[in-house]
């Protein structure tokens, strides 16, 4: 497991909103330790037995917090993430999509400088199977096992996790890094953590067209990775210049093309699955 486990104490920013309340219940049902919530103007109330504060600073004065998850509307989401980082919260999971790109550029830089780790935006979050879920993924498809997943896609992640669970391989930690062009944590940031994690025996890297994160990850794998990695690239049939579902899934010139990603994976010795079921076959093969 990496980053989170059943002891991780979680703050929910935007806990009183519709999504915030719904997912707080889902996370609590999964066993996640939610210690506090924040919604400006709603301090002193409770949501599902969780105390609500007006500010993150106030919440951390009353509770030990290891991670924050953010369900705040797009115009205020980057500021919410910065508020968490300034309060010293080490892990920040930003679910919100549609955050202005310039807001994200600023937030990512500042959060890094403050020493916190940002996952997202526009991501499903992070789950350590059967331990804790800090996100919006369907918890029941994640069975505890041997494979780490890092993904730019939400739904493909759930399908891959379900397939690995059904095959008896299961997952350790799964991180949805988000589908936007500017995100806080990339494949390359997480690979070293899985590389050192005693429970993870193989890693599935679910990329998609657009950007160069997959290429950078492949270069890192080639030079440093001790464990087998299996790749998958979503959106391989997409035409150039057309955004496919995610803001980050757009091919500009020769950067972000499926060919460029497949070439990088091939050079790093990463086998690439064409289907979700093939991910399972390749992981089985890699683990012997």
Curated annotation (Swiss-Prot):
Disulfide bonds: none annotated. GO terms for molecular function: nucleotide binding; succinate-CoA ligase (ADP-forming) activity; succinate-CoA ligase (GDP-forming) activity. It comes from the Bacteria. Gene3D superfamilies: NAD(P)-binding Rossmann-like Domain, Succinyl-CoA synthetase domains. One of its GO terms (cellular component) is succinate-CoA ligase complex (ADP-forming). Keywords: Ligase, Nucleotide-binding, Tricarboxylic acid cycle. Optimum pH is 8.0-8.4. Substrate binds at residue 158. The active site is at 246 (tele-phosphohistidine intermediate). Pathway: Carbohydrate metabolism; tricarboxylic acid cycle; succinate from succinyl-CoA (ligase route): step 1/1. PROSITE patterns: SUCCINYL_COA_LIG_1, SUCCINYL_COA_LIG_2. InterPro entries: Cit_synth/succinyl-CoA_lig_AS (IPR017440), Citrt_syn/SCS-alpha_CS (IPR033847), CoA-bd (IPR003781), CoA_lig_alpha (IPR005810), NAD(P)-bd_dom_sf (IPR036291), SUCC_ACL_C (IPR005811), Succinyl-CoA_synth-like (IPR016102). Succinyl-CoA synthetase functions in the citric acid cycle (TCA), coupling the hydrolysis of succinyl-CoA to the synthesis of either ATP or GTP and thus represents the only step of substrate-level phosphorylation in the TCA. The alpha subunit of the enzyme binds the substrates coenzyme A and phosphate, while succinate binding and nucleotide specificity is provided by the beta subunit. Can use either ATP or GTP, but prefers GTP. HAMAP family: Succ_CoA_alpha (MF_01988). This is Succinate--CoA ligase [GDP-forming] subunit alpha. It comes from Thermus thermophilus.
């Amino acid at each position: 497991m990496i980053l989170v486990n059943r002891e991780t104490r979680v703050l929910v920013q935007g806990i009183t909103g519709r999504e915030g309340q719904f997912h707080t219940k889902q996370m609590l049902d999964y066993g996640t330790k939610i210690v506090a919530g924040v919604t400006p103007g709603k301090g002193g109330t409770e949501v599902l037995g969780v105390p609500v504060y007006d500010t993150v600073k106030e919440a951390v004065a009353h509770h030990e917090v290891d991670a924050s998850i953010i369900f705040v509307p797009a115009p205020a989401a980057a500021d919410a993430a910065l508020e968490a980082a300034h309060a010293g919260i080490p892990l920040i999971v930003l679910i919100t999509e549609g955050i202005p790109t310039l807001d994200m550029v600023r937030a990512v830089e500042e959060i890094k400088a403050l020493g916190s780790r940002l996952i997202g935006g526009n991501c499903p979050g992070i789950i350590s199977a059967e331990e804790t879920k800090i996100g919006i993924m369907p918890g029941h498809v994640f069975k505890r096992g041997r494979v780490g997943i890092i993904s730019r896609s939400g739904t493909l992640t759930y399908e891959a996790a379900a397939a690995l669970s059904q095959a008896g391989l299961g997952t350790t930690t799964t991180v949805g890094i988000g589908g936007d062009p500017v995100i806080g944590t990339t494949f390359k940031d997480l690979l070293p953590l899985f590389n050192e994690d005693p429970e993870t025996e193989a890693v599935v890297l679910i990329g998609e067209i657009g950007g160069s994160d997959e290429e950078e990850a492949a270069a890192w794998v080639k030079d440093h990775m001790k464990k087998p990695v299996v790749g998958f690239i979503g959106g391989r049939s997409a035409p150039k210049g057309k955004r496919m579902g995610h803001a980050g899934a757009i091919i500009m010139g020769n950067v972000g093309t499926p060919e460029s990603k497949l070439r990088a994976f091939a050079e790093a010795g990463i086998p690439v699955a064409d289907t979700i079921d093939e991910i399972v076959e390749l992981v089985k093969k890699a683990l012997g």
